[in-house]
Amino acid sequence: MGETKVIYHLDEQETPYLVKLPVPAEKVTLGDFKNILNKPNYKFFFKSMDDDFGVVKEEISDDNAKLPCFNGRVVCWLVSADGSQSDAGSVCADIQSDLPPPIERTGGIGDSRPPSFHPNTRGSQENLDNETETDSVVSARRERPGRKETSEHATRINGTSKMERRRDTGGYESSSTLMSSELDSTSFFDSDEDDSTSRFSNSTEQSSASRLMRRHKRRRRKPKAPQIERSSSFSSITDSTMSLNIITVTLNMEKYNFLGISIVGQSNERGDGGIYIGSIMKGGAVAADGRIEPGDMLLQVNDTNFENMSNDDAVRVLRDIVHKPGPITLTVAKCWDPSPRNCFTLPRSEPIRPIDPAAWVSHTAAMTGTYPAYGMSPSMSTITSTSSSITSSIPETERFDDFQLSIHSDMVTIVKAMSSSESGLEVRDRMWLKITIPNAFIGSDVVDWLYHHVEGFTDRREARKYASNLLKAGYIRHTVNKITFSEQCYYIFGDLCGNMANLSLNDHDGSSGTSDQDTLAPLPHPGAAPWPIAFQYQYPLPHPYSPHPGFPDPAYIYGGGSAGSQHSEGSRSSGSNRSSTEKRKDRETKGGDSKSGGSGSESDHTTRSSLRRDRAASERSVPASEHSHRSHHSIAHSIRSHHTHQSFGPPGIPPLYGAPMMMMPAPVSVMGPPGAPPSRDLASVPPELTASRQSFRMAMGNPSEFFVDVIKEFWGV
């Protein structure tokens, strides 16, 4: 009797293995090789000769197939199946009775399934086989002692006894089901049940869909004592996943413009394996229904069954049905997601954000009153939004439920409600081109939120137009500052919403004389008293006063003067708009003192007026030192007189009406903000520095005139 040498390579190992089969080379089969090798979880590729390609590696899976032989030996490559991690040993087989052999799959819906597919209900067993494309079978055993009697006469599968299967409908028991999912290799499943056979696949009468198990590690059992009648499950999948869950969804296409699904076809060498839901688009009929999910298997559309239908035909039929008017009925088999996303995620209404230490400290300080209150109303409190990390000043009683939103509401109110943590808008960190966008939201979510929470929109298009107006107004902002609104883009809340912490709604008291005035002022002088950060209303700046070139230069007053100029100071500092005629009358009543400074107050210290007075003084043969002394004395007298009169303007803020160079010196602040530098009265400044300081202020007030006067002085004009 001849023998055959078989050289086989195992996976990626460099050194091949050699076994000898006691069978002649012309009669050796794959079953003979498997009996010697006993490696059930491998694919077998043999060196073969093809007429078109020459020497190739041919996969052989039929145990009765003869092996190709070259020079009296067989060369084989063993490749482990994907996801297969089995131990060596034999697998227990059914030894109950002779069953008809499995029906060969002819291609159809049950031919191939993605690993995430799982059924949840039981149905009839019509037109159903229990063998998948990987030759996986289900067997049952009632009595263990019969194994030795029949195992020698049974055919072999993967080096183990292959018993003929019995077709029977039966229930499931969690303690008796053995499951494995060697998708790409020849394997089988057995079950120890007393009264019924555990089925690996089943279907309903209308779908005849088979189920493909998720790939799992299969452990082969060692022979047990005869008295053990049951065995526990080797799989982590419970019996609730062993049944097929089929749902029928009827969609009303009159309310929606499109179906909103993408389909994926599954195919293999034996034919097409069915149509599956690839993705679901927002705004479609399927997304609005919510019961169909990605990965579900599409079994039937209206009255058209997709069984034994190719993928191309199924797509064509589905396209024709969608184009027809009327409702659409979809019958799908639910899938089982191996990586659920919603089990351990937080609900949308309670988003969690990383702790911002600065916001935490400021919030705690505001609650405990550590910082001085700069115009905070007692009914106001600082609330940190967890959804958008925006620190905004809103009343304690103002919550999302209190907002009565309509299309006539202010945009600020709508955006404030949208940014609330209880609004329902999904605001979280997003990834875009590997860039993390903190606290972002999708444009389509904004449109949906506006359409459902703001009254007055007749359709979704109006809500989208309103969202576009929010973008143009700056209440929401694109990550790259695009001004065109798109529902597929990410957006964040704009600066107008983020800077609400700077708003102050308190009314100023009348102690400073500004209770009846509307003023717009810059930040106060460091030595001045604290002033509110912002105002409720903003008025346009008044037009600066500019005398006609033909008129003589008026005497611009910086502070209070003598008793005769008290009315002039009070009216100007309070911001009243006096006409130029009244100003000229005041100067006429003051006599000729305006030539030397205007009734004892500080005269115009711009460079232009200073140079003109110097030239006039030289013509009258008045010493410059006398003019300088008189001018400094006027400054000191002006400061002293300023403290004797009532101030009618905000501290440290220039009057709004009059020439642009009018400016009052800041009074001495009794109480300054924390950390402010100590201030010094202008009267205590040395005389040689006072004039320079005032001249610098005048030059900064109107630098163009300063430049012209310097040019004139240089050329002696």
Curated annotation (Swiss-Prot):
Involved in the signal transduction pathway mediated by multiple Wnt genes. Required during ciliogenesis for the docking of basal bodies to the apical plasma membrane. One of its GO terms (molecular function) is beta-catenin binding. GO terms for cellular component: cytosol. Residues 173-189, 564-579 have a biased composition (Low complexity). Residues 118-127, 199-210 have a biased composition (Polar residues). Residues 1-82 form the DIX domain. The keyword Cytoplasm applies. It comes from the Eukaryota. Residues 212-224, 629-645 have a biased composition (Basic residues). GO terms for biological process: canonical Wnt signaling pathway; ciliary basal body organization; cilium assembly; intracellular signal transduction. Its main location: cytoplasm. This is Segment polarity protein dishevelled homolog DVL-3. Keywords: Cilium biogenesis/degradation, Cytoplasm, Developmental protein, Wnt signaling pathway. Belongs to the DSH family. Residues 140-155, 580-593, 602-618 have a biased composition (Basic and acidic residues). It is found in: Cytoplasm. Residues 248-333 form the PDZ domain. Expressed throughout the epidermis. Residues 89-235, 552-653 are annotated as: Disordered. It holds the Pfam family PDZ. Residues 421-495 form the DEP domain.
